Amino acid sequence: VLEANVQMTPVSSSAVVVDTDRYPNLDAVMAAMVEGDDRYRYSVAWVDCMRRGASMGRGILTRGDHLDDPTGKVVVPRSSKLSVPFRPPSGLLNRASISAFNEAWFRVAPKHEVGALHEIGAFFHPLDGVANWNRLYGPRGFVQWQCAVPDAAGDVIARAIERLSAEKVPSFLAVLKRFGPGNEGPMSFPMAGWTLALDLPVGPAALPRVLDELDELVAEAGGRIYLAKDARLAPRQLPRMYPRLGELLEQKAIVDPKGVLRSDLGERLGITTQATH
């Protein structure tokens, strides 16, 4: 890359003004996120994938914007950093332990808090406050799964969480966000609508099948999976989720006619093979 133009958002401070609310179920969380689209620059919710019935998908919604501080006098102290000192057994994160954690996490969050100041890094990357957090998943690790679906397919989010709960596939981290339009790139992931990101411990026998079912659900709704996190998507789903895949293959054939540029993801999804034919 010889030259790149990057569009930046000008800010006058390193703080974010944050409002936090707890909601009893997924419907209430999503309704609040839609209602606040015009009032908040950033909106993210933690949702509880372990609950069923009337409290399915209960969540903690945090919304905010950059603090306007042209004088630069406001200083937000950095949060103290915790650390996971050892790698626990893989079985530690199971349905029972994650349900207990989710209950505590939900209760500790404020029911309604307005105007709290958060350090910008802590707001955007809360897991960075816990060093070696990945050790919590034990030696078997975890699988990341993230989808984006159009506004009109918001019910896919509820159906995905229902499947996870019904199949007893636990998610230690489930994050729901609103997306604006994607860019003009043929493989752009965002689309105006919703994105759900999950961290799932490796272990449950049903996990591969459930994720395949969620992939199908997303594809049928006109959505897509985030390839930067993917490690197991079936190749047949790629052109359904990324209908402009052909444009990428055409460009790759021009700039890399001998197929020198390769990756494990490209090999698994057949991108490399298609581009060299």
Model-assigned labels for residue ranges:
Residues 1-277:
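Noncatalytic alpha-helical scaffold of FAD-dependent oxidoreductases
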